[in-house]
Design a protein with these regions (language model features):
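Short small-residue beta-strand/loop micro-motif enriched in glycine and branched aliphatics
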Residues: 191-194, 246-247, 420-421
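Non-catalytic, mostly N-terminal accessory regions of nucleic-acid modification and defense proteins
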Residues: 1-215, 273-282, 287, 382-386, ...
Length: 514
């Protein structure tokens, strides 16, 4: 039943999203739709929690609040702040906005107040950083919603009414996170239509699963997990779920995507005290300078520019390599940053463009430092091209471990040819994912797929990690039987001669030739 509800919820939510689609770009209507879903979730969650708390007294949230007992009100507020991290007075609940719509009122002022009240309820509490500015991207005065105030009100009312008719399944007893899964599905659907912008906030679930499976290998429980470029938080959530992580840390540069990540955490039921997502530039302003993590995962922006400022030569994250990543390509700056935050027993896995495997100059020096001096590189996994939204370039996964003192090899996997093509996108199927993860975990050699290269072999290749140097995927063509080909040609020539004769006969009968 829960799987049926899961699929039904996905379809219903995407139908609602398309109500806004004609009025604005994919990214714009994404933030409105996901924001309203989140508002409904917070409202239903608080009503459900308080109603359950008051059930023995034969009361519910709205009745208790209407009694005007100040002591009871304060108790309810305190309970919600401890359990949920926020509070919504009944007049600002989603259901109250729906009542106003049914009364044919202009609900935009009430809706705007409601969203602000949720944020304001956390001021001075431990959850303030998790809720502050959470709805700042929902601009109810946006001309994209309509030309007049009435047009805007009608469109928003239509969306809210449609969402109101959808059961979020919060009361479903299931091992499937029904609403969380639907939210992830929505983000993925928006990413599919967002073109190049998609890479800023979304890592395909198949890639997230590979990264999560790799960094949790051999671990029954993670103390913490970290993503320095966390986007919408999907990769973090997948890894945290895989590794039963106690704490989740992330940093995101884009303020709008940062809001999306925090919503995603809360909507997946991660308690406000169990995650810390910060807004800022990871390389320029590290939000967690003293922290180290059991698992580090990331899908950083490919070959982005960074300042490579002189000050970074004295930054512990980069100084040990003796050289900075080039200004035009921050790939190794992100990799060194992640390694710095990885604890001694942890595992790091990040997505990168293939250029990091073979480019020279400062990047070649950093690569040699990581292999020759530190022996940190555990595996290189080549992925198919065109599996990320917004870019068709082939990518790889770099796996790093600090506890490799006794390992004198690096595993190379070429999974670039194993995928299913769906329209314009390539997709990894479950069997492809399983093969990659199993090969990594067992560190096994498979002809034309994987190779366990010794460090000496890598050194002999001048620390070039380009996968074709280690995994030979060349398919030899079957030998050609020259005699058989010559005979086939002769047979065809004989058939052609016969046909020419037949054509001549027909042409003579028609009087077209003498």
């Amino acid at each position: 039943m829960s799987e049926e509800l899961q699929q039904k919820l996905r379809t219903q939510l995407w139908t609602v999203a398309n109500t806004l689609r004609g009025n604005m770009s994919a990214s714009d209507f994404m933030y409105f739709t996901l924001g309203f879903i989140f508002y409904k979730y917070l409202s239903e969650k608080i009503e459900m929690c308080i109603d359950a708390e008051l059930e023995e007294d034969g009361s519910n949230f709205k009745e208790a609040w209407a009694s005007n007992e100040e002591e009871l009100k304060e108790e309810l507020k305190k309970f919600c702040m401890n359990e949920l991290g926020y509070f919504i007075e009944p007049e600002y609940l989603y259901s109250s906005v729906i009542e106003a719509i049914n009364r044919k009122e202009n609900i935009l002022p009430q809706l705007e107040r409601s969203l602000k009240k949720i944020e304001d309820s956390t001021i001075g509490h431990d959850s303030e950083e998790d809720f502050g500015g959470l709805f700042s991207d929902i601009d109810l005065a946006s001309p994209k919603l309509g030309k007049t105030a009435e047009d805007k009100n009608n469109l928003i009312s239509e969306v809210l009414i449609a969402l109101d008719g959808i059961d979020f399944g919060l009361n479903e007893a299931s091992d499937i996170d029904i609403l969380g899964d639907a939210y992830e599905y929505m983000i993925g659907q928006f990413a599919a239509g967002a073109g190049k912008k998609a890479g800023e906030f979304y890592t395909p679930q198949e890639v997230s699963q590979i990264l999560a499976d790799i960094v949790t290998t051999g671990k029954t429980r993670l103390k913490n997990v970290y993503d320095p470029t966390c986007g919408s938080g999907s990769l973090l959530l997948r890894t945290a779920r895989n590794g039963k992580a106690d704490l989740i840390y992330g940093q995101e540069k884009n303020p709008t995507t940062f809001n999306l990540a925090r919503m995603n955490m809360l909507l997946h039921g991660v308690k406000f005290s169990d995650f810390d997502i910060e807004n800022g530039d990871t390389l320029e302003d590290d939000a967690f300078p003293e922290e180290q993590f059991d698992a580090v995962v990331a899908n950083p922006p490919f070959s982005a520019a960074w300042s490579a400022a002189e000050k970074f030569n004295n930054d512990d994250r980069f100084s040990k390599a003796g050289v900075l990543a080039p200004k035009s390509k921050a790939d190794y700056a992100f990799i060194l940053h992640m390694i710095h935050h990885l604890n001694e027993g942890g595992t790091m896995a990040c997505v990168a463009p293939h250029g990091v495997l073979f480019r020279g100059a400062s990047e070649g020096k950093i690569r040699r430092f990581l292999i020759e001096k530190k022996n940190y590189i555990d595996a290189i996994i080549g992925l198919p091209a065109n599996i990320f939204y917004g870019t068709s370039i082939p990518t790889c996964i770099i796996v790093v471990k600090k506890c490799r003192k006794d390992d004198d090899n690096i595993l190379f996997i070429d999974a670039s040819k194993e995928f299913e093509k769906i329209k314009t996108q390539n997709k990894l199927r479950p069997e492809h994912i399983k093969k990659i993860v199993d090969t990594y975990r067992e560190r096994k050699e498979i002809e034309k797929y994987s190779h366990l290269a010794t460090l000496q072999e890598v050194a002999d290749n001048d620390y070039n990690l380009n996968i074709p140097r280690y995994v030979d995927t060349f398919e030899e063509e079957e030998p050609i039987d020259i005699h058989a080909v010559m005979k086939e040609i002769k047979d065809l020539e004989a058939k052609r001669a016969d046909l020419d004769k037949q054509i001549d006969v027909y042409l003579k009968k028609l009087g077209l030739v003498e």
